[in-house]
Amino acid sequence: MKEDEILVQETNSEFYHAFENLSIERMERLWKHEDNIVCIHPGWDLFTGWLAIRESWITIFSNTEMIKFIITNTKVRVFGNVAVVVCLENIETLVNGEILRLGVIATNVFEQIDNQWLLIHHHGSSVSNYIRPNIS
């Protein structure tokens, strides 16, 4: 794996750590703060611009007790100052006291700005008939 691909994969991992920690502060550091960025959560409407995206994360974090990710099937491609990551989010979350396991296919697009990779696009789509792989 090339150096840029490694840095992008590390930033992608940090995105999921911020999500697991329900940390808007960590999430803020990972996103480009402009009006033309996009976020699509599974089953939600399109959010455009950092302020709307930030509010969507606050809503998710305030309504989530616990969430854990195991990321698999990761593909990283770098095209100059833009990178695309496609991965499977193997999610374990707590809903009404019950553990729920689900899968989401995600596309995360990053732009390199001042040697830092920032999210400019996140799209998650639920996997129908999800079967959790044998992972720990």
Roles of regions detected by a PLM:
Residues 2-32, 36-136:
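A beta-strand edge to alpha-helix "cap/lid" segment located at domain peripheries
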